[in-house]
Amino acid sequence: MNDIFYMKRAIELSKLGEFTTAPNPNVGCVIVKNNIIVGEGWHEQAGKNHAEINALIMAGEKAQGGTAYVTLEPCNHFGKTPPCCNALIKSGINRVVISNIDPNPKISGNGILYLKKHGICVKTGLLSKESKQYNKGFFKRMKTGFP
C-alpha cells in the first residue's frame, strides 16, 4: 500500500458527506499505522466533528506514530468545533498527507505551518485535482465569495 491508495480511500470517504456538510466542504480522513487502516472518518454535518476527529476517535491509541491522510488541510482555529490540528498533534500522529490546501483565509496554509511547527511531517498536493472535484462549490465560494 502507498500514499495514493490511502488518499483515494480518504476521497471516497469525503463523498459520504456530499449532501450534509454545506456550507462546509466534504472532507475524508484515513489514519494508517504499519500499513493498516486504524481509523476512518468524514465530515458528516456542518457544526459536527470534522473528518480528522472522527478518524481519530476510531483509531484511538493506535493513531500514535501513524499517518493521517486528509483531503483538505486540517483547521487550526476554533469555530463551531475545536482545531483539528491540535487533535492530530495530541494523538501522536507523526505524518500528515494533505490533498488540498484549504482556500479559507482563516486556514490557508496556517494548518500546515502549525503541524510542522509541532514536529509533524507534512506532504501536500497528493491527488489534489481528484479531491478538489468533490468540493467545486466550496473552492469557488472561497475564491469569489459567490456560491
From Swiss-Prot:
Pfam families: dCMP_cyt_deam_1. GO terms for biological process: riboflavin biosynthetic process. Disulfide bonds: none annotated. Keywords: Hydrolase, Metal-binding, Riboflavin biosynthesis, Zinc. It comes from the Bacteria. It is an enzyme of class 3 (hydrolase). Belongs to the cytidine and deoxycytidylate deaminase family. NCBIfam families: eubact_ribD. This is Diaminohydroxyphosphoribosylamino-pyrimidine deaminase. It comes from Buchnera aphidicola subsp. Acyrthosiphon pisum (strain APS).
